């Protein structure tokens, strides 16, 4: 036990901290919005499992899950030129209202609002109207403002802070 004690305790502290923080945020946003981590994880699948144990969901587990078109891809070529299988799930990251309104016409499975204010998201979603597109908020979302994002009409809220800057719980081992 003593040979692996520190490693096991470190892992337990980290994953317990992630699960606890996730659970706190899940309770704040309610049942209609899914709280997920971003891909910014130190321990990959271990961190993502901790999020699910806390009541959250997972974003992508890897590049094989779905296609995520980010700003760098958009700068290199127009997403209209991409050949995407109708069976593929794809999401596009948008940084401006004009991008959202442009790409919503291409009927992606999901649109990520990157660094938008909750009020802006709410207005844009209202302007788009009823759709089957999943809306995700990401960027600069904190425990203090997460409820505003949850009320904006999004289906998913992704936070890098769930895994890259969570406070580990204080756990120790006593042998009796």
Question: What residues fall within each predicted segment?
Answer:
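Acidic/glycine-rich phosphate/pyrophosphate-binding loops and surrounding catalytic core
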Residues: 1-106, 110, 119-127, 133-136, ...
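Short secondary-structure boundary segments
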Residues: 115, 139, 161
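Cys/His-rich Zn2+-binding cysteine-cluster or related metal-binding knuckle/ribbon modules and their
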Residues: 143
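Active-site loop ensemble at the mouth of alpha/beta enzyme cores that anchors a bound cofactor
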Residues: 172-176
């Amino acid at each position: 036990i003593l040979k692996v004690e520190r490693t096991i305790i470190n892992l337990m502290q980290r994953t317990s901290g992630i699960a606890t923080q996730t659970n706190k945020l899940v309770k704040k946003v309610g049942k209609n919005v899914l709280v997920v981590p971003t891909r910014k994880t130190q321990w990959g699948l271990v961190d993502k499992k901790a999020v699910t144990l806390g009541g959250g969901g997972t974003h992508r587990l890897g590049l094989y899950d779905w296609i995520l078109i980010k700003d760098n891809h958009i700068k290199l070529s127009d997403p209209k030129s991409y050949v995407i299988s109708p069976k593929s799930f794809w999401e596009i990251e948008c940084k401006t209202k004009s991008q959202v309104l442009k790409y919503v016409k291409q009927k992606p499975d999901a649109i990520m609002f990157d660094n938008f204010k909750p009020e802006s998201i709410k207005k844009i979603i209202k302007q788009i109207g009823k759709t089957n597109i999943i809306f995700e908020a990401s960027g600069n979302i904190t425990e203090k403002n997460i409820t505003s994002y949850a009320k904006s009409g999004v289906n998913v809220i992704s936070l890098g802070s769930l895994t890259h800057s969570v406070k580990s719980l204080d756990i120790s081992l006593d042998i009796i």
